[in-house]
Amino acid sequence: MKPTILLINFKDQQKLRKLKMALLPFKIRLKTVESQDYCQPIGYLAGVKEIAKVETASTEILSALIPQEQMEKEMLILAGITGNLFDQVLYTLRKAGTPVDYKAVLTEHNQNWNCMQLYKELEKEHQMYHP
């Protein structure tokens, strides 16, 4: 899998552009995830070959069950980015002035989750550390 950053729920196009420009030198795949794909496994969205796309009929059912309006904040998922590159990416995001409250790393544990499942988990963690 090529190092990838998934960009989810970015409504501010200027902020999204600034973030993409800041990350351009790293030659990392940046993928803006559209709301119709929020029910797909994040591993699939990041390009993990072993994770299959959810079928269309299932997608429509899941979309009905996942209220997108509940996703209020932006979310950034780092996949296949480790070590020094990971540190450099986070430093660059901070330096560029493009804060993203909800950040996650793709893991074996969460790669089968959809965007909303991960969002809810990050929301719980955020509330725990920032009451």
Predicted regions span which residues?
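N-terminal, charge-rich interaction modules
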Residues: M1-K53
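Helix-rich interaction surfaces within compact, conserved domain-sized segments
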Residues: T4, K15-M21, P25, F86-P131
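Structured loop/turn residues at secondary-structure junctions
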Residues: F10-K11, I81, N110
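Low-complexity, flexible helical/coil segments
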Residues: Q40-L45, P67-E72, Q111-L118
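Noncatalytic linker/hinge segments flanking ATPase motor cores
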Residues: L45-I51, I77-A79, C115-K124
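Short, structured active-site "lid" loops
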Residues: L45-K73
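Mid-chain, well-packed structural core segment of small domains
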Residues: S63-A96
